């Protein structure tokens, strides 16, 4: 999310620079403004989520009605009290997987049980890390074309943030392993 917002921010700064130099025609500037505004509007819809929000989204994705979310602690207790005969039922596995999501959400990264959940987290973190590395690479190329010292300072600052975020994600991945 931060990387895409960063790209939109850099695009906005580049647009301002273009306007200052007055090298574009008025129509091109308007097209670039519209494109930048559309990008910012699109990216703002992707807000950071907590584990609890992700759990609720997963529950909704699995077609559980929203009224049951208010009763989630009671439902979890009911799931834990299911008899052995019901465990053999075909509904038991999806219900059990829902309870695992809430248990995992409150745990330290190193104590998440080995399995599919840990693999999914690692896969997503590695994907985020690779996208941040690509963004860092693109920012390093953008530095070469910048002549304004303010823009240069902003890009260098954002590259540092990008690198620090990459290091934090790699550290988190190592703690999960």
Swiss-Prot record:
Keyword Transport attributed: yes
What the entry lists under InterPro entries is as follows: Flu_C_NS2
UniProt keyword annotation of Transmembrane present: no
Pfam families noted in UniProt: Flu_C_NS2 (PF03555)
- The record's principal subcellular location, in a coarse class, is virion
Which of UniProt's keywords are assigned here?
Host nucleus, Host-virus interaction, Transport, Virion
Sorted alphabetically, the Gene Ontology cellular component annotations on this record are: host cell nucleus; virion component
- Motif Nuclear export signal at which residues? 91-100, 117-127
Q: Where in the cell is it found?
A: Virion; Host nucleus
Annotated function: Mediates the nuclear export of encapsidated genomic RNAs (ribonucleoproteins, RNPs). Acts as an adapter between viral RNPs complexes and the nuclear export machinery of the cell. Possesses no intrinsic RNA-binding activity, but includes a C-terminal M1-binding domain. This domain is believed to allow recognition of RNPs to which the M1 protein is bound.
Q: Assembly state and interactors?
A: Binds M1 protein. May interact with human nucleoporins and exportin XPO1/CRM1.
Q: What is this protein called?
A: Nuclear export protein
Q: Which gene name belongs to this protein?
A: NS
């Amino acid at each position: 999310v931060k990387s895409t917002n960063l790209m939109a921010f850099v695009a906005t700064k580049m647009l301002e620079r273009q306007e200052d130099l007055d090298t574009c025609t008025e129509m091109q500037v308007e097209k670039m403004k519209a494109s930048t505004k559309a990008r910012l509007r699109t990216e703002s819809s992707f807000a950071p989520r907590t584990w609890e929000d992700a759990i609720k989204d997963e529950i909704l994705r699995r077609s559980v009605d929203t009224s049951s979310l208010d009763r989630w602690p009671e439902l979890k207790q009911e799931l834990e009290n299911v008899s052995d005969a019901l465990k053999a039922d075909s509904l038991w596995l999806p219900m059990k997987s829902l309870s695992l999501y809430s248990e995992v959400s409150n745990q330290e990264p190193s104590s998440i049980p080995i399995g599919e959940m840990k693999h999914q987290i690692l896969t997503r973190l590695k994907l985020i890390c690779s996208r941040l590395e690509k963004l860092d690479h693109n920012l390093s190329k953008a530095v070469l074309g910048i002549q304004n010292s303010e823009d240069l300072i902003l890009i260098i600052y954002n590259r540092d943030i990008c690198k620090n975020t990459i290091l934090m994600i790699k550290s988190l991945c190592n703690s999960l392993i």
